[in-house]
Amino acid sequence: MNQKLLKLENLLRFHTIYRQLHSLCQRRALRQWRHGFSSAYPVWTAQLCAWPWPTDVLTGAALSQYRLLVTKKEEGPWKSQLSSTKSKKVVEVWIGMTIEELARAMEKNTDYVYEALLNTDIDIDSLEADSHLDEVWIKEVITKAGMKLKWSKLKQDKVRKNKDAVRRPQADPALLTPRSPVVTIMGHVDHGKTTLLDKFRKTQVAAVETGGITQHIGAFLVSLPSGEKITFLDTPGHAAFSAMRARGAQVTDIVVLVVAADDGVMKQTVESIQHAKDAQVPIILAVNKCDKAEADPEKVKKELLAYDVVCEDYGGDVQAVPVSALTGDNLMALAEATVALAEMLELKADPNGPVEGTVIESFTDKGRGLVTTAIIQRGTLRKGSVLVAGKCWAKVRLMFDENGKTIDEAYPSMPVGITGWRDLPSAGEEILEVESEPRAREVVDWRKYEQEQEKGQEDLKIIEEKRKEHKEAHQKAREKYGHLLWKKRSILRFLERKEQIPLKPKEKRERDSNVLSVIIKGDVDGSVEAILNIIDTYDASHECELELVHFGVGDVSANDVNLAETFDGVIYGFNVNAGNVIQQSAAKKGVKIKLHKIIYRLVEDLQEELSSRLPCAVEEHPVGEASILATFSVTEGKKKVPVAGCRVQKGQLEKQKKFKLTRNGHVIWKGSLTSLKHHKDDISIVKTGMDCGLSLDEDNMEFQVGDRIVCYEEKQIQAKTSWDPGF
C-alpha cells in the first residue's frame, strides 16, 4: 500500500515537472528563435527547432530531469554534510532588482533564475529579463542556489540617524524685542511699485531700471523721519513671492497693494490679493497715480469689493491711501499707515542665539563671488558665522547693506547681503546658523541623503507602476494571442512593435520644426525663477511645443551655446552679458542669443519667436467690388455659358486676380474669371463706375440680380501665438 502511494506521489511530481518544463522550453525556444541558438545547448537546439515537439522527446527530457531530482533527494544527507564544510557564496541584493541583475550578482545566466522559480506561485510566462522581482522571490532564488544574501547599503541606511538642523523652539516672550515690519509691494505691471519705493529710499532705482519695471527682488531698509524703520521687498510681478510662499517662507508681515487710479483692478492685482490671502498677510491699499486727471480712487475701492478687499470707507479694515508716486504726494501718510498697522500686529523677535532667516535672492557678483540677500528673522548675524540653507552652506566672510556698505552685524527684520557661500541656495530657503563647518557639512550631507532616499522611493513607485502596466499589457496580449501558436504570436507582436519604432532623423526634423527649445540665463536666482513661472503659463502646445532645455544664473557661456546648437534652440538672457568670443561662436553655429533688460520685452520676444514657428495664415485683401444688374447666356461652341452684366461699385476688377460670388452675405463661389468684356472688347481691368460682362470658371453657376462679385488678392501673413502670459 505504501509503495502504491509512493508511486502515485512520484507520478504527480512527474506531471508537475512535465508542465513546468513545457513552459520553460517555450520561453527558451522563443528567446533562441529571436537571437540564435547557443552553442552551449546543442542537444536542446535540435529538439527545439523541430515543431511541433515529439511527445517522446519531451517525455524523455522530463524523465531525465525527474531522475536527476530523485537522485539529488536521495543523496541529500551526504550532500548537505559536504556543503556545510564549504563557505556559502554571499550575494549582494537590493529591493526591486531585475532578473538579469540578480543573475549577474549570482554569476549565473538568466535561465538559472527562471529554473529556480519553477516550483513557485509566480507566473513565469509573464517574466522577462528586465522584470523586477519582489523581496520574497529574490530570497527564494538565493536560497535554492545554496547562497547567502546580503541586502545592499541602500536598505541598511534607512535606519541612519537624523543629522538635520531645525529651527529653535519659540523664545520666552520676556526675551523678545520690537522689530521693524517687513513689507512687500505688490500690484499690476507698471502701476508704479518701483517709483513708490524710489521715493521712500531717496535713490534713483526707478530711473535706472528701464521702463520703470522691477528687474529682480531687492530688499531695502527705509528709515523714516519719525525714527521708525520699514524693510521693503520689491518683487518682479510677484512671481518670486509666490515661489517663496510655496516653500513655506513666512517673510512678509504686510502687503502694500498698489493699484493705479486710472487703470483700476487688473489681472495681476487679483493675483496679488490671492497671494496675500493665502499667506494670511494684512493688506494696505495704495491708490497710485492720483495726480492724473482721469484718476478715480473711489472706482478702485468699489472694484476691490468683488475680491473681498473692503476698505475702511465701506466698513472694512483695509486702510486705503491715495498717493502719487511720481510727485510724492501723501507718501508719508502711507508710511504712517504701515507703521500703525505694524504696531497693532506687535511684531517682535529674539535677537539672541543662533541666527534664523530666509534667502530673498541669490546671485553671482564678479567681485564678491556667490552672494545671497537675506532677511534675518531671529538672532544676530556676525562675520564668521556658519550658515546652512537648503543643501548649501557658508562661512560668512562679508556682510553689506542695500547700499553696498560693509556692516558688522545684522539684526531681525534687517536685509543683508552675505558672501562666503560654497553653493547658491534658492530664493525662499530657510537659513539656520550651526556651530561649526563640520556640522554644516553634516547637515548638508544628511539633506542630500534624504533627497536621494526620496528620489529612490519615487523611482520605486515608478518601477511598480511600470511593472503593473507591463503585467496588464502582458495579460491583454495573452488574451489576444493566447489561442495562436508561438511563431504566429511572435510575428504579430513584432509587427505591432514596428509601428511604435521612433521616427527617423529626417522625419524627426520635420516634426521638430514646430518645437522651440529655449535656454534661460538670468542675473539672479529670482529673475530666473520669475521667467520660469511665466513660461509655466504656456498653454499653446497645440500650436508649437515650448521646451526648456536649460536655465541658470550668470552670463551666457560656451556650454549654453553648445546646448542651443544641439537642440536647435534660442538663448534668452536677462540682465546678463555674452562676451565677444561667445557671440562669435554662436554666430558660427547659427545660434540666436537674445539679451534683454526688461522682463516683458523678453516675453514679447519669446512670443514673436513662437509665432515665427507657426505656419503662415492667408488673408484676403479686396481689390474691387461689382453688383450684378442683369443675367444672360452666350453660346460658345455647343454649350451655353452664363454671363453676368455688372457695374463696378468700388475699386477695380482685375482679371488675373481671384474672385468670389456672394449672395445675401454668403460666399457661394470662389475661383477665376474665364472672360471679362467691356461691350464686345476683352479687357483686363474694369474701373469704378464702368459696366462689364463676365463669366466664371464654373459653368453651372446661376447668377441672380443683386449678387455681388468681389475681386481680391491673397496675402500670407505671419500667424501669432495664442499664448497670453498676462503682460
Swiss-Prot record:
Residues that span the membrane, as ranges: none
Ranges where the record places region G4: 288-291
Keyword ATP-binding: no
GTP-binding in keyword set: yes
Subcellular location: Mitochondrion
Residues annotated with Phosphothreonine modification: 688
A Gene Ontology BP annotation from the UniProt entry: mitochondrial translational initiation
GO cellular component: cytoplasm; mitochondrion; nucleoplasm
Domain tr-type G residue range list: 178-348
Region of interest: G2: 212-216
Transit peptide location on this chain: 1-29
SUPFAM superfamilies reported in the protein's UniProt record: Initiation factor IF2/eIF5b, domain 3 (SSF52156), P-loop containing nucleoside triphosphate hydrolases (SSF52540), Translation proteins (SSF50447)
Region of interest called G3, as start-end residue ranges on this chain: 234-237
Record region (G5): 324-326
Stretch list, region G1: 187-194
Molecular function as annotated in GO: GTP binding; GTPase activity; ribosomal small subunit binding; RNA binding; translation factor activity, RNA binding; translation initiation factor activity
Keyword entries, A-Z: GTP-binding, Initiation factor, Mitochondrion, Nucleotide-binding, Phosphoprotein, Protein biosynthesis, Transit peptide
UniProt tissue specificity: Expressed in all tissues examined. Highest level in skeletal muscle.
Taxonomic superkingdom: Eukaryota
Amino-acid positions noted as binding GTP in the UniProt annotation, renumbered to this chain: 187-194, 234-237, 288-291
Family per similarity comment: Belongs to the TRAFAC class translation factor GTPase superfamily. Classic translation factor GTPase family. IF-2 subfamily.
Main function: One of the essential components for the initiation of protein synthesis. Protects formylmethionyl-tRNA from spontaneous hydrolysis and promotes its binding to the 30S ribosomal subunits. Also involved in the hydrolysis of GTP during the formation of the 70S ribosomal complex.
Record text on subunit structure and interactions: Monomer.
Name by which UniProt lists this protein: Translation initiation factor IF-2, mitochondrial
Species: Homo sapiens
Taxonomic classification: Eukaryota, Metazoa, Chordata, Craniata, Vertebrata
